[in-house]
């Protein structure tokens, strides 16, 4: 088929799809997916590597793709996205993340956010010692500590920072990333929470952290995971109590994120 004839056929398919207002969301989504497959095949044609269509098509296509993604934390985090949770040290980011992971694994609502389907969640805890985690999530029952009952789908991973680098590894960040991928695959987890980026940065170099984040961007783009990264914030301004804060670390943190949200104390109350 010659190039001009192909373009004309694709233009007619796009026009027909956009005019079909009576089709159900499922039918339109299926049509868009088929059209994308055809365009992806054509993308490698030696004549033209661009995918071209009416502006409305791209909006509709993205809307349908977003429609398929389930929300994990309202509009703040959805399936197939990288979200960054920021906050100053000691604000409660880890506790927030553990409670969120628990809700996701149990398929329960989390505060004002509606419940998602139960899922297996890999919580990579690089911050808390075993003693701290046990103390935080135990309660006193008849004078004895009783551990909190987590849902079966909540999985916690820890990393021994004194682990020597195996042959073939040049950075601790690469070892951590590969270990996360291996653990997620072995335990059938597609929802991953990393707690935290500052801990990784403290044990490595900034250029290795950048590579670490870019590999997570690749993981997201491959459609294989939903990722929540825990980060620190620094005050913006000259005073320590500045209201505005920014995500600490290299700028790549903000560029790979689909959304960024923070925990902060209320202005009229010390509580979050």
Stretches with model-predicted labels:
Residues 63-70, 174, 241-244:
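Short gly/ser/thr-rich secondary-structure transition/capping motifs
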